[in-house]
């Protein structure tokens, strides 16, 4: 067997795509290895959402090339950098053999064969008329991912936020048919999944076909929840514009749906939200939060924030801080604005100085960290259900699981009893990024 090494950068959709690529090349005689030096085929599945994420690719390529012992190794750059930069990847890293975009994954086996025969550069960054999900063989879907699994139900974006490359790298919004998703969910559960996270760039924009009808995300979740041995359902990433009635109601009514929503807002300033083309206001966003909390009092939230978008003033930034204070997030992710080539935001003349972005980011992260620690501390003394996988902790006999709120929970498991199980855990101690407890 030949060695396959895959390194994944970025979002959960990339993790899912890497699983698809692994499954689609295995029939060519590849088995996964843990080190690029042992590999005959190296795939770097990339992220282009920020400049730093893209530059990680070229750093890793340089490292692999400098330590390359196998002269027959095939190097593939996949994902959003591949889609956005195309031939530029070959210019910056001429030793790369294949560049393949996210929508061209079904062509990967053919590209590998072509590259081995031609010994030249091979590229496919097409947006085919037939969605990639419809072109991949059935055996690519539903294989074991352990006790927690990803399932892509929607891909692409029609929102065209002015800071974002996703519409250009992932294409227009596409929703997979209901029956196809349900079949994959059944297979995942059959192969050990107790939790499924439904994925999409705008997952709550889902509008999949089922026997002549169009289903939204709320209806899909209710349907998937009928799978008997499935115990937890999550979804990510959602957009405030796509919240709809059945999604609100399924949060209130379906116990398998976790009480945790990742709902990116990006800014608390209406002026900046308008400049970002978000097409919602801070007040509308807060209204969504309030309604979900009324329907499901134990629900908690995470979000994404961009600091220093062009034109952001101190007043605009303070409005973001006020929104964070109002919501009180369980966790949140924050980044300095990174101009992406080809996006309207990158063309603006009123870019915020780097030192101002850095200072604001530190202030925001301090507030977010404070809220996260307070939320974690609020769990002390409570007993919560924790899903464990095979992830080990820093200490001997320690295993790590996930709370309903995506917190890492560490417990001692000397007899290896908790792997792939949901266990009630009493929380004894809270840290910034984790909880410590014991089986109740």
Curated annotation (Swiss-Prot):
Keywords: 4Fe-4S, Cytoplasm, Iron, Iron-sulfur, Metal-binding, S-adenosyl-L-methionine, Transferase, tRNA processing. Coiled coil: none annotated. [4Fe-4S] cluster 1 binds at residues 11, 47, 80. It comes from Wolbachia pipientis subsp. Culex pipiens (strain wPip). Gene3D superfamilies: Methylthiotransferase, N-terminal domain, tm_1862 like domain. Its EC number is 2.8.4.3. Pfam families: Radical_SAM (PF04055), TRAM (PF01938), UPF0004 (PF00919). GO terms for cellular component: cytosol. GO terms for molecular function: 4 iron, 4 sulfur cluster binding; metal ion binding; N6-isopentenyladenosine methylthiotransferase activity. This is tRNA-2-methylthio-N(6)-dimethylallyladenosine synthase. It is found in: Cytoplasm.
